[in-house]
A protein has these predicted regions:
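Transmembrane signal-anchor/signal-peptide helices with a preference for the extracytoplasmic
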Residues: 34-55
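Membrane-interface junctions
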Residues: 17-24, 81-84, 118, 155
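Short extracytoplasmic
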Residues: 58-90
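Helix-turn-helix repeat elements of alpha-solenoid scaffolds
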Residues: 27-35, 63-74, 101-109, 135-143
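N-terminal positive-inside, membrane-proximal cytosolic segments immediately preceding the first
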Residues: 1-31
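Flexible helix-coil transition and linker loops at the boundaries of alpha-helical arrays
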Residues: 41-45, 79-82, 117-119
C-alpha cells in the first residue's frame, strides 16, 4: 500500500512540509547563495589586492638603480606593508643588491636574511641563502656561513651550496673539508667542466704538496 493514496494527500503532505520546514529551507538557500556570492567577492577582492601589490612592486622597482636613497626608503616601506606577499622577498633581494653596489656588506646580509625569512618559495630561499653565506664569508663569519647553508635546500642548488661551503672551510684553513666540498660540487651532474671549481681543487692540491 502506498504511503500516499491520493494526489490530494500528496499535496497536503507537501503543504505540511513547507509549513513546518519552509522557513529553514529558504534560509538555507539564501545563506548558501550568500555564501557563494561572498566567496566570489572574497576571490575578487583577493585578486584586486594582488594586482595592487604587483603594481606597487613595479613602482618601487622602477626607482632601483636610479635613486638609491629613494629606492631604499620606498622598498623598505613596501616590505613593511606587504610582509605576507611573495613580493616582499623579491624586494629584499633588490635591497641587498643595492647595498652591495656600495659594498655595505652588513646591510646586504640583513636584507638577504629578510628575504629568507619572508619567502615561502624554496628557490628564492636557496638563492638568498647562498648569497648570504658568501657575504658572511666576506665578513669573515665562516661559522655563520656554514650554518646558513646547513638547512635543507633544493637539490638543484647543491653545487653552489657545496662550493660556498668549500670557500668557508678554505678560509678556516680546513683544507680537507674544503677539498671534499669542492669535489662534491664538481660531482653534481653538469658541473664536470666547471673550470673555476676545478681550479680551486688544483690550488688545494698545490697547497697540500707545498705543505708536505
Amino acid at each position: 500500500m502506498d504511503v500516499y493514496q491520493t494526489e490530494e494527500q500528496q499535496v497536503e503532505a507537501i503543504k505540511g512540509f513547507w509549513k513546518e520546514n519552509g522557513t529553514a529551507v529558504i534560509a538555507g538557500l539564501v545563506l548558501g547563495f550568500a555564501g557563494f556570492i561572498g566567496f566570489n567577492v572574497y576571490k575578487d577582492t583577493q585578486l584586486e589586492n594582488e594586482v595592487l601589490t604587483s603594481d606597487a612592486y613595479q613602482t618601487v622597482m622602477e626607482s632601483a638603480g636610479v635613486d638609491g636613497k629613494a629606492f631604499s626608503a620606498s622598498a623598505s616601506k613596501f616590505i613593511a606593508e606587504n610582509k605576507d606577499s611573495s613580493y616582499a622577498s623579491l624586494t629584499a633581494l633588490a635591497l641587498a643588491k643595492e647595498a652591495a653596489t656600495h659594498k655595505d656588506w652588513p646591510q646586504v646580509a640583513i636584507h638577504l636574511a629578510s628575504a629568507i625569512e619572508s619567502s615561502s618559495n624554496q628557490g628564492i630561499k636557496a638563492i638568498a641563502s647562498v648569497r648570504l653565506a658568501r657575504v658572511q664569508i666576506q665578513l669573515e663569519q665562516y661559522t655563520e656561513a656554514l650554518a646558513t647553508l646547513s638547512v635543507t635546500l633544493p637539490e638543484s642548488f647543491k653545487s653552489a651550496i657545496e662550493e660556498t661551503k668549500g670557500d668557508a672551510y678554505f678560509k678556516q684553513g680546513k683544507v680537507e673539508l674544503a677539498r671534499n666540498a669542492y669535489q662534491a660540487a664538481l660531482d653534481v651532474e653538469g658541473q664536470t667542466n666547471n673550470g673555476a671549481l676545478q681550479m680551486k681543487l688544483n690550488d688545494l692540491a698545490q697547497l697540500s704538496s707545498i705543505a708536505k
